[in-house]
Regions:
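Sec-dependent N-terminal signal peptides
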Residues: 5-15
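Extracellular carbohydrate-recognition regions
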Residues: 21-42
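Extracellular beta-strand elements of beta-rich domains used
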Residues: 29, 189, 207-211
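Short carbohydrate-recognition loop motifs
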Residues: 49-69
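Extracellular/lumenal carbohydrate-interaction signature centered on repeated Trp-anchored short motifs
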Residues: 73-84, 158-161, 182
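Solvent-exposed strand-to-loop "edge" motifs in beta-rich extracellular domains
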Residues: 87-93, 116-118, 172
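Extracellular/luminal beta-rich ligand-recognition
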Residues: 104-149
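Extracellular beta-strand ligand-recognition surfaces/modules
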Residues: 106-111, 147-148, 153-157, 161-201
Length: 214
């Protein structure tokens, strides 16, 4: 499927970068928060629904040929809270696609962190932390749609299929490693499940996404 704009570019434009949000919890997955998240879609919206279990609230994402993300403007001090923590699960993955190509650039689950680096939204830099269906943990590559975003595998269904897994990464160090940037603050965060290229059905869950000092 040919895209006029990349998914990454559309997600980056979610943010106006105005107010300071003094919090380290990225998403609470409450109804109030859900109703106020900014939505950007490529063609058809991914189905997002709220739920809860013994560990708290979660967001369920279902896509079959759809692609839309949920994002918010949030200022994170990476000198104080550089670690991003994500608890997530992929119930139905996208086995067999080439995630590094334009035709296969779909992910069952992904979390974007965004840094404003220029005068326009499309000049911003992003790291796209992904729950891969085919690649190994620790692998990374530039998005086939924009050099401003790098995909970085934090989890894979090759080792964690249909089970909750919690991952942690140092975002400040990741920006230096992947973009060669010394970043003190983040400006936005977004989540997305998309299958608009592969048209395969995917189901994933997001829970307890937050930044921490250690």
């Amino acid at each position: 499927m040919i895209k006029t704009f990349s998914i990454v570019a559309l997600l980056i434009t979610l943010f106006n970068f105005g107010s300071f949000a003094e919090e380290i919890q990225a998403f609470n997955f409450t109804k109030e928060e859900f109703d106020n998240l900014t939505v950007r879609k490529i063609k058809k919206k991914t189905k997002y629904t709220l739920g809860s279990n013994e560990n708290g609230n979660f967001l369920k994402a279902e896509a079959e040929g759809q692609a839309s993300g949920l994002g918010k403007e949030i200022l994170i001090n990476l000198n104080k809270t550089p670690f991003l923590n994500i608890t997530w699960k992929v119930e139905k993955d996208l086995f067999g696609i080439d995630e590094k190509s334009k035709k296969g650039h779909d992910y069952a689950a992904r979390v974007f962190v965004i840094k404003k680096t220029g005068s326009t939204a499309l000049s911003n830099r992003a790291i796209n932390y992904v729950f891969s269906s085919n690649e190994e943990i620790g692998q990374y590559w530039r998005s086939p749609f924009t050099k401003k975003s790098i995909d970085y595998v934090l989890a894979t269904t090759k080792t964690n299929n249909n089970e909750w897994v919690t991952v942690k990464t140092n975002v400040k160090k990741d920006f230096k490693k992947l973009h060669d940037l010394d970043v003190d603050e983040l400006n936005g965060v977004a989540i997305m499940t998309d299958t608009d290229n592969s048209k395969i059905k995917s189901i994933a869950y997001y829970q307890n996404i937050y930044f921490s000092s250690e």
